[in-house]
Amino acid sequence: MTSTPRTLMVMAGGTGGHVFPGLAVAHRMQAQGWRVVWLGNPAGMEATLVPKHGIPMEYVRFGGLRGKGLATKLALPFNLLRACAQSLRALRRVKPDVVLGMGGYITFPAGLVTVLTGRPLVLHEQNSIAGLTNKVLAKLAKRVLVAFPGALPNAEWTGNPIRAELARTEPPQARYAARSGKLKLLVVGGSLGAAALNEVVPRALALLAPSERPQVVHQAGAKHIDVLKENYEAAGLACGSDVELVPFIDDMASAYASADLVICRSGAMTVAEIAAVGVAALFVPFPHAVDDHQTTNAEFLAEQGAAVLVQQRDLSAELLADWLRGQSRESLAAMAERSRSLAKPDATDEVARVCAAVAGANLEGKQ
């Protein structure tokens, strides 16, 4: 007679920073025979992305107030009650053994209803500064997990769940030692393109002598790739063997592992992935992030000499060119090793184990 599998409900939505770590845990639990159901917003990216991973969805409509008008704020009580009712119906249908909240607006009403109906709630905060939802729910959850130490009081530091292939990358010492010739630079703008990086990096490279100039792979998002090409051409740098411009990178593990240096924003998942792989990084935090959390994310590595932090207001072609002139593969390798030493490569397993334990089960092995 086959026993009924235990069920995990993942609550996450809105941005990749919430959704991708949730997917990492979901796949880990599925590999152990668990049934996984996702609770998200039908208007969020999760509604398109999660079903592609073979995970069924339940939906709750709820949004935030930040930057919204008076009408939205006045409608909050009604919208919250509606979201709570939708959450209650979803929980009754799914009957989860444990609920994992990974962030996003829907986590607030769904988390409240989870607790009020007596189901165990596990929370995970991805950023170095916790959002309001997790600050409230942390007082009600069975277990509270954080990616950065100190993000929430009395929480367990697990790190951020990442894709398995990133955690399995060859150690930086071996990778850097096997290379010779020009430095290899990876610039990651993400889907939004990071216009500041697209403008400054080509001009900085143009200030370097050809012998000093690294080989570059610059990712900028499909909407920005034409402008990026124009920026490189205006700087006198034609695309070719030493300059590759791409709209998207499918295999980030290989891209990180092939680079001596990464220049990028400092979202929570980016910082976690760079540390897990062990690669030198120059972080330029997005200046308009909520609570300036990208700065504190980057500081976690930068304060340990495991990365360099430059605020966007301070970034210039001259500053970047001068800094690049002072780097060697040896200095970048040392930075990469410090970064790897601060990583939590088993974060996915740890979060999954906590979920299983709260449900009264065990999780076997590692991913």
Curated annotation (Swiss-Prot):
Membrane topology per record: Peripheral membrane protein
Binding residue positions for UDP-N-acetyl-alpha-D-glucosamine: 15-17, 127, 163, 191, 249, 294
Family matches, as SUPFAM superfamilies: UDP-Glycosyltransferase/glycogen phosphorylase
Cell compartment(s), UniProt: Cell inner membrane
Cellular component per GO, a single term: plasma membrane
InterPro entries associated with the record: GlcNAc_MurG, Glyco_trans_28_C, GlycoTrans_28_N
Pfam families per record: Glyco_tran_28_C, Glyco_transf_28
Gene3D superfamilies for the chain: Glycogen Phosphorylase B (3.40.50.2000)
Biological process terms in GO annotation: carbohydrate metabolic process; cell division; cell wall organization; lipid glycosylation; peptidoglycan biosynthetic process; regulation of cell shape
Pathway the protein contributes to: Cell wall biogenesis; peptidoglycan biosynthesis
Keyword Iron appears in the UniProt entry: no
CDD domains according to UniProt: GT28_MurG
Lineage: superkingdom: Bacteria
Catalytic activity: di-trans,octa-cis-undecaprenyl diphospho-N-acetyl-alpha-D-muramoyl-L-alanyl-D-glutamyl-meso-2,6-diaminopimeloyl-D-alanyl-D-alanine + UDP-N-acetyl-alpha-D-glucosamine = di-trans,octa-cis-undecaprenyl diphospho-[N-acetyl-alpha-D-glucosaminyl-(1->4)]-N-acetyl-alpha-D-muramoyl-L-alanyl-D-glutamyl-meso-2,6-diaminopimeloyl-D-alanyl-D-alanine + UDP + H(+)
Physiological role: Cell wall formation. Catalyzes the transfer of a GlcNAc subunit on undecaprenyl-pyrophosphoryl-MurNAc-pentapeptide (lipid intermediate I) to form undecaprenyl-pyrophosphoryl-MurNAc-(pentapeptide)GlcNAc (lipid intermediate II).
Name of protein: UDP-N-acetylglucosamine--N-acetylmuramyl-(pentapeptide) pyrophosphoryl-undecaprenol N-acetylglucosamine transferase
The organism of origin for this protein: Burkholderia thailandensis (strain ATCC 700388 / DSM 13276 / CCUG 48851 / CIP 106301 / E264)
Gene name for this UniProt entry: murG
